[in-house]
Structures are given as structure tokens and as C-alpha cells.
Amino acid sequence: MLNQFSRTELLVGNEAMERLNKSRVAVFGIGGVGGYVCEALVRSGIGAFDLIDDDKVCLTNLNRQIIATRKTVGKYKVDVMKERMLEINPEVDVRIHKCFFLPENAEEFSFEKYDYIVDAVDTVTAKIALVMKAQKAGVPIISTMGAGTKLDASQFKVADIYKTKVCPLAKIMRRELKKQGVKKLKVVYSEEKPTRPFSDMAISCRTNCICPSGAKHKCTERRDIPGSVAFVPATAGLIIAGEVVKDLGIGV
């Protein structure tokens, strides 16, 4: 019988669709990358999700985040993403967590219940903690490296963290993961050299912050404000979603 996933099933088969439907994926960070991960995965038939983010939609998110519209500004990102996912598939199980994952609250999450973990957060401390906890639990994880300060979406690659180059965030991650004894980590990274922001615009963002009331990560509190465009983080998110689908459903 035809259903909303029939076109996907034509490509991957019934058994793969059943595996995807029975899988629970945790997405940490529902922003420019994570939002597109969720979008592609729910459209691919993943049956259950945990969404983790404590931030609210900001007007400055409209240039790149799939959850950002004029109507959603000021709303929690996880609330908006959940509503969108249920509109796509009313039967999907979506659990939301309005918090920012850090080593201090890592014990609040039981990673063993996840079939796959997506790291789409920005901070190194959180990324390292996610990788360590995922690998301890024996759950596959994929991490996004830097998607800001980029203009060429064609330069994204999938690789082990220790085979990455150019990306400044990947360099830091290689160093920190090596200290922790982590042997491997699948990542999506870009080999495009970062583009420096126009300094007057970066200063303007800090001094004229328009983040919504109650936002946890205001411009005034950020050390760096990277420039971004719609098509780069979206591409990274779609590549990550493809890796998750292949690993969970197709096994390639």
C-alpha cells in the first residue's frame, strides 16, 4: 500500500524502512545544521527522536535555519522543530529537552536508548562530552565541524576526525580527542578556508543584539559571531542525515 515513504522504499527496500522506523535518533543542537538533520531524517522514516537545545529562534536565524520564520521568532527551537516534524509525520515520536548538553548534566541522558547520536552543537566542551559518552555507551555518533564562515557547500566531506584538514574546529577536536584517548570519530567537515567576517558587522551584532527575551546564547555573550549563509549549514545537515540513514537502514 502506498504511503508517504513509498518513494524512499522504492530506493532502499522494505526491510531498511522497517529498521529506520524502529530507530531512535538523538539530535543535539537544533540550529542551522541540526534543523536540516531533523528535517531529512523525519522525511526518511526515522520513527523516534530526542531533540536537545535550550535556545530560542532569533531574527538572525532566518537566513539559514529551517525552523526560523517571522512567526517562530522567540519560540524554543525544540518546540518549533517538534511541531514541524509532526506535521510531516503525525506518527513520529519526538521527545524534547530544553537544555544545553554539558559534562555537568551528561548523566541526565541515557545514551543506551539511542540508536544513533548527531552532534550538531557549537562548543568544543559539549562536543567532546557527547563523543565520550556516546562511545562509552557503544552508540554510533557523527559530529559536524565548522559550518560558519563558509561559502562553498561543495567542499564538505565525510571522514574520520584524524583525517580532516583545514577546518579550525576539526583541528581543536583532533587535539582534544587524542588527549581523551578517542581513536576514531565520523565527522562532516569542510576543506574551505574560513572567510573573515566584516569587522564592523561583527561589532554591530554585539552592540545591537536583537536576540529574543530569555535567549540563552545572546550575541553580547559570544566571543565570536561567525558569518553564515543558507546553503552551507543546510548541506552539512543533509550530508549527516544521509550518513545516519545509510548506517541505520542500509548498512553501507
Language model: regions and residue ranges:
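Hydrophobic/small residue at the entry helix of a nucleotide-binding pocket
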Residues: 33-34
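N-terminal charged helix/coil linker that caps or initiates catalytic domains
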Residues: 1-26
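Conserved N-terminal Rossmann-fold NAD(P)-binding element of oxidoreductases
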Residues: 27-29, 52
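Conserved SAM/SAH-binding loop
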Residues: 98-106
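Glycine-rich phosphate/adenylate-binding loop
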Residues: 2, 109-116, 121, 126, ...
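Glycine-rich phosphate-binding loop and adjoining beta1-alpha1-beta2 segment
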Residues: 46, 51-89
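Aromatic pocket-lining residues of Rossmann-like dinucleotide-binding sites
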Residues: 41
